[in-house]
Amino acid sequence: MGIMATRFVMNVLLLLSLLFASLSNAGHSAWEAGATTFTSEWIHIDPSFDFPTWPHETIRYYFSTPEMKEEFANDIRAAWQLWYAAGLPETFRFIEYSRARCEAAPDDCLLIIAEYGAPSFFTSLGRQRIDPWDRNVMYLAFQGTEDEHDKAVIIAHEIGHAWGLLHEHQNPLFWQWAFRGTRSDSLVQFYCENVLGFAEVEHEVNNTLLLWAEDGPCRDQARAYEFGFLASEMIPWRPRYQQPHRLWPHDSDVDWDSIMIYESHSFGVDDEHGNKKLTLVRTKDLQVIPEPGTVTELDVVGMVHLYHPRYGKFREVFHNDASSAWYAVFKDKIKNCLIKT
């Protein structure tokens, strides 16, 4: 009897040890610092009502006009091949559908508008309707001087957005702010005064301190958007996001070659010689961030994580969370609840 009791106790202790061992590793480094997972470099949307992802790992796209399809179809396919070449599983599909089928179910398709003109590129993040089309859209305006490789790289960047990837350089953990700019312990140094449109914003604000305030257009993404200021594409991402970094990442934690990063002269004004001024550099030795050359393996890791979290589902956003799409409804229901005393 004593032996059986001893075995029972030992089995209970063993089960408890296994339970606590599994609980200690149950966090996910995408949202919990210190979770025991490998560290990789990427940042993507937090799937939600505002930023839904594509079902069945499939994006169906269509062109706005037959002429656009004839001109740009090969460029789109070449860009998608860069993702496969970097190791993206072929379970991810980016396939063309007919305009008629997509117009019948616009929420299930990505509208591609491509043309030549003043360079401009923007894309829905996941299945996010954007103005002025009220559709999931990829907008591509090429200058006309780009070669085939340059086009493919630009489109591959936009495809990353379409799936839900964010700009690598906009990870909030990479940024540390000083009184008027970025601190020396920030992983990047930002030169707001060199960004196109700064002079107009400075004139409108008319206060240097307010430019760099916590809610100023050189520091706050939402405020920069209000001014139509391109710094919004460079400074930290404000909405919810997921990424794997520890609380204080190092320079080596950043994928400086990511297809989703901006090179150091992006949106820079011209200097007296007609060259673009620096807008964003690495703090380490003030190194210049190069123009992305292709999709990296770590870009692929980020996309795979977005559609296949290592520990199952993403965290649930409860209705009583202020960031929940149902928060307003929740508050209204609470007010109408009958409380018995």
Residues covered by each model-derived region:
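Zinc-dependent metalloendopeptidases
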Residues: 23-341
